[in-house]
């Protein structure tokens, strides 16, 4: 069994009195999710999340390590993948998609994010993040 680990975050901003989160659409599969990527040797989970968000979107973030949610799934029969998600406040709002991987990026009102997200695991995490961001 192969084990893979990725880290990412629900990136948010406060915009005109609302909370919006950043969603990305992947080129290969066409699914909507959060920015994330594989942990590189010597990196912490937080460092991985920051690097991947910057690479995929061009946005710098402040990670809140007190919010840490994990998702586990099997992308292939012999592979278990664990994804660690944090919440992260955007320091800048203009995005620049990583053209090799990202088809589209958009800011979405957190209350409507579950209608855009593809996977149920992501919808569950955004509901938990919603509470953490508002508290």
Residue ranges and their predicted role:
Residues 37-128:
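Unchanged
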Residues 31-34:
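Short small-residue beta-strand/loop micro-motif enriched in glycine and branched aliphatics
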Residues 131-135:
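Generic C-terminal helix-cap and adjacent flexible tail
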Residues 22-25:
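Short, acidic/hydrophobic/Gly-rich beta-strand patch recurrent on exposed beta strands
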């Amino acid at each position: 069994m192969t084990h893979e680990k990725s880290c990412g975050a629900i990136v948010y901003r406060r915009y005109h009195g609302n909370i919006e989160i950043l969603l990305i659409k992947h080129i290969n599969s066409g699914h909507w999710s959060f920015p994330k990527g594989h942990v590189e040797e010597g990196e912490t989970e937080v460092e991985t999340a920051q690097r991947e968000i910057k690479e995929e979107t061009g946005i710098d973030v402040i990670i809140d390590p007190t919010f840490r949610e994990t998702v586990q799934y099997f992308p292939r029969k012999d592979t278990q993948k664990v994804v660690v998600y944090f919440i992260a406040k955007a320091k800048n709002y203009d995005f620049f998609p990583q053209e090799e991987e990202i088809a589209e990026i958009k800011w979405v009102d957190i209350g409507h994010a579950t209608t855009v997200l593809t996977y149920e695991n992501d919808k569950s995490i955004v509901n938990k993040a919603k509470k953490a961001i508002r508290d």
